[in-house]
């Protein structure tokens, strides 16, 4: 059973840097106690969270809600019409940003100016590096979740996430997931696009490198509608692929233009566009893990955490040191792509560049940075980003002096039963058990507060998560 720390203070979260931190709206009871305004004049709809409200400040991360608006200050918190029974409340989000546009951000007013409602914008400052996972929904409508790093690029800032979703006819109840790596002591603004009405942010979960839940400990291919992984060594030999460094004990070289997947959901081609170092080294030894048997070697002319513009494939494959993998990914159905990566204790960035967005000019939709350092070279990081149907994305990694490992990618379209939030995936604490009551009288909500059997939503008992309905 996973060990967790439950803190019963009203605004407390999981305080140890070895745990995960849940960022969720305060409960309705707490809002009433603090005198927060009722939403639309009646607490049956929720309440308004005031600006400059510290949601969490523990050993791992500090999160403050402040939308920077004087006309629509604060954030509406909904407790009804949530499109789900998994969560019992949600931050309402929106901004002056457009769906899938990635316009530059120079100050908080750039994203809060002209907002239609009090919408949540978060300032997130990790004290320890790790990954931030968000669980969001906008019914059947399109929306983008943005994470802007205010510190990166020598203080000029850049997007590290611009994850777009449009579940459309697949169901308004689908809960999407976005995961991005954050750098210690950087400050990030998290906001959503304006879509005509509010986007729902149910919960954010921050997992530092030190958490036992950070690294991937097993890989279940059945959880994805399409898996992208290196061909087996036996297949490489059958096809006559060149042995890596002259001996198959090290792996092989995957040729350019290799189609890795062409399913009903997605097409994936490996092509680094290089004439000097064509193909991609596939390692079968020295890959820092026993969870996977092989890995794509990745690297490029891009730097760690720099987010330079990309105009063509040569921009990222020029002067690469080895045959490094670059992927062209074209979803046929919208969904989410999860990547499993590693670079030992060294720093690296996984980039996803949308070549189609911004009227064909392109933009980053992911720039997830990792530096596990002293936490262990075997840690496997995860990155999850929403992809738009019929867009083409280039996926590459920064150059770090040696190769980054991409063990596998998994894609789930909106139609997949494993899309987005899953009860057996991490939602901060432990496994979720649906409609099964715990045996003890002591029950907590996700904020560590004692509740009873009449409480609706996520509750905690003995380190496990349950849904009370």
Predicted regions located by residue number:
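Extended extracellular/luminal ectodomain segments enriched in beta-structured repeat modules
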Residues: 125-133, 185-186, 330-338, 390-392
């Amino acid at each position: 059973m996973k060990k967790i720390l439950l803190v019963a203070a009203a605004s407390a979260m999981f305080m140890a840097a070895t745990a995960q931190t849940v960022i969720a709206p305060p409960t309705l009871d707490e809002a009433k106690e603090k005198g927060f305004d009722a939403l639309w004049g009646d607490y049956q709809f929720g309440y308004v969270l005031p600006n400059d409200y510290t949601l969490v400040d523990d050993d791992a991360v500090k999160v403050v809600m402040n939308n920077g608006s004087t006309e629509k200050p604060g954030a509406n918190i909904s407790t009804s019409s949530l499109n789900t029974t998994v969560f019992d409340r949600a931050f309402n989000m929106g901004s002056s940003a457009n769906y899938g546009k990635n316009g530059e951000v120079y100050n908080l007013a750039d994203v809060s100016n002209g907002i239609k409602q009090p919408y949540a914008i978060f300032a997130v400052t990790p004290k320890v590096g790790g990954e931030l996972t968000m669980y969001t929904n906008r019914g059947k409508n399109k929306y983008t979740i943005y994470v802007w790093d205010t510190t990166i690029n020598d203080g000029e800032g850049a997007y590290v996430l611009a994850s777009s979703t449009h579940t459309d006819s697949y169901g308004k109840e689908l809960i999407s997931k976005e995961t991005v790596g954050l750098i210690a002591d950087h400050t990030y603004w998290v906001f959503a696009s304006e879509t005509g009405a509010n986007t729902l942010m149910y919960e954010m979960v921050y997992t530092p490198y030190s958490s036992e839940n950070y690294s991937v400990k097993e890989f279940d291919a059945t959880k994805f509608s399409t898996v992208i992984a290196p061909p087996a060594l036996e297949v490489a030999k059958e096809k006559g692929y060149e042995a890596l460094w002259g001996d198959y004990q090290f792996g092989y070289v995957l040729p350019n233009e290799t189609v890795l997947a062409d399913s009903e959901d997605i097409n994936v081609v490996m092509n680094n566009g290089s004439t000097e170092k064509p193909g991609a080294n596939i390692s079968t030894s020295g890959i820092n893990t026993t969870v996977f048997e092989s890995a794509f070697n990745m690297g490029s002319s891009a730097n760690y955490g720099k987010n330079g513009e990309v105009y063509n494939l040569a921009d990222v494959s020029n002067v690469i040191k080895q045959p490094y993998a670059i992927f062209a990914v074209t979803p046929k159905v919208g969904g989410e792509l999860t990547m499993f990566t590693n670079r030992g204790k060294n720093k690296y960035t996984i980039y996803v560049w949308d070549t189609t967005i911004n009227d064909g000019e392109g933009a980053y939709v992911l720039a997830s940075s990792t530096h596990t350092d002293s936490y262990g070279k075997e840690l496997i990081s995860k990155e999850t980003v929403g992809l738009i149907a019929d867009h083409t994305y280039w996926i590459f990694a920064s150059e770090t002096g040696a190769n980054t490992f991409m063990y596998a990618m998994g894609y789930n379209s909106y139609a997949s039963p494993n899309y987005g939030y899953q009860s057996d995936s991490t939602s901060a604490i432990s496994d979720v058990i649906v409609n099964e009551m715990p045996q003890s009288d002591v029950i907590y909500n996700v904020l560590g507060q004692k509740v009873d059997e009449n409480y609706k939503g996520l509750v905690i008992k003995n380190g496990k998560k349950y849904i009370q309905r």
